[in-house]
């Protein structure tokens, strides 16, 4: 019997999810940054800045950015590791990766770039000081396997940062749901000419594990210590996992 998983609120075969997610991000890649600013009111920049500023990344470190998309975090990591460090920008989606690579090149920033599946990372054990994934984990079919891979490629003492939509503060939930399921698809239709992809976005956020569940998943994946910080009343959470 075929194994199933969630694609938003739909139940699909596991083998089909990656293709469906790929279609979403091929469709939205060119408008991704504009839509991020519109959907979050620019807050995504603050969330990412918090991630960068609390990571403790220093010159000479090796950093892997997974599902790095248009390169926001990779740019910030490169500025921090300097010429002696190493930052890899990776994504499973070629359209997103092309946008990110070209954007960084336009800024004069040359980074190694790779199409990579987070569930089968093409990197050796214990190679990176830090691994980051921002707004990408919820789209992965086997999150548990992806987290194990992230732990594998980290050096002992290394750190995983997961920045992801999470469970919002309960009193805000009615307003947040109205915004997510009415406003987001409408913005997607008007700006990106793609309401369906932004309907999936809203649904995928609701299906993603909450803060404590994700913490437990990271511990199960091999991280010795995990903590998290809620941002914007839990709209987003930053989880930090430490490989001991």
UniProtKB/Swiss-Prot annotation:
One of its GO terms (biological process) is methylation. Belongs to the class I-like SAM-binding methyltransferase superfamily. MenG/UbiE family. Its EC number is 2.1.1.163, 2.1.1.201. SUPFAM superfamilies: S-adenosyl-L-methionine-dependent methyltransferases (SSF53335). This is Ubiquinone/menaquinone biosynthesis C-methyltransferase UbiE. It comes from Laribacter hongkongensis (strain HLHK9). Keywords: Menaquinone biosynthesis, Methyltransferase, S-adenosyl-L-methionine, Transferase, Ubiquinone biosynthesis. It catalyses: a 2-demethylmenaquinol + S-adenosyl-L-methionine = a menaquinol + S-adenosyl-L-homocysteine + H(+); a 2-methoxy-6-(all-trans-polyprenyl)benzene-1,4-diol + S-adenosyl-L-methionine = a 5-methoxy-2-methyl-3-(all-trans-polyprenyl)benzene-1,4-diol + S-adenosyl-L-homocysteine + H(+). Methyltransferase required for the conversion of demethylmenaquinol (DMKH2) to menaquinol (MKH2) and the conversion of 2-polyprenyl-6-methoxy-1,4-benzoquinol (DDMQH2) to 2-polyprenyl-3-methyl-6-methoxy-1,4-benzoquinol (DMQH2). The keyword S-adenosyl-L-methionine applies.
């Amino acid at each position: 019997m075929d194994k199933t998983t969630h694609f938003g609120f739909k139940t699909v075969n596991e083998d089909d999810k990656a293709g469906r997610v790929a279609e979403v991000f091929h469709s939205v890649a060119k408008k991704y940054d504009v839509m991020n600013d519109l959907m979050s009111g620019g807050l995504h920049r603050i969330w990412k800045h918090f991630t960068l500023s609390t990571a403790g990344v220093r010159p000479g470190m090796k950093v892997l950015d997974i599902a790095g998309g248009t390169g926001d975090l990779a740019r910030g990591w490169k500025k921090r590791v300097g010429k002696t460090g190493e930052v890899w920008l990776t994504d499973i989606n070629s359209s997103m990766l092309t946008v990110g690579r070209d954007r960084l090149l336009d800024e004069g920033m040359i980074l190694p770039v790779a199409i990579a599946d987070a569930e089968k990372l093409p990197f050796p054990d214990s190679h990176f000081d830090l691994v980051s994934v921002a707004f990408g984990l919820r789209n992965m079919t086997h999150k548990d396997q992806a987290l194990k891979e992230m732990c594998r490629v980290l050096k002992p003492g290394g750190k995983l940062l997961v920045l992801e939509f999470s469970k919002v503060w309960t009193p805000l939930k009615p307003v947040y749901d109205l915004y997510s399921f009415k406003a987001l698809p409408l913005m997607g239709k008007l700006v990106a000419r793609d309401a369906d992809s932004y309907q999936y976005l809203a649904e995928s956020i609701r299906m993603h594990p909450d803060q404590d569940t994700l913490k437990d998943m990271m511990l199960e994946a091999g991280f010795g210590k995990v903590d998290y910080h809620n941002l914007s009343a839990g709209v987003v959470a930053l989880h930090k996992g430490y490989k001991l």
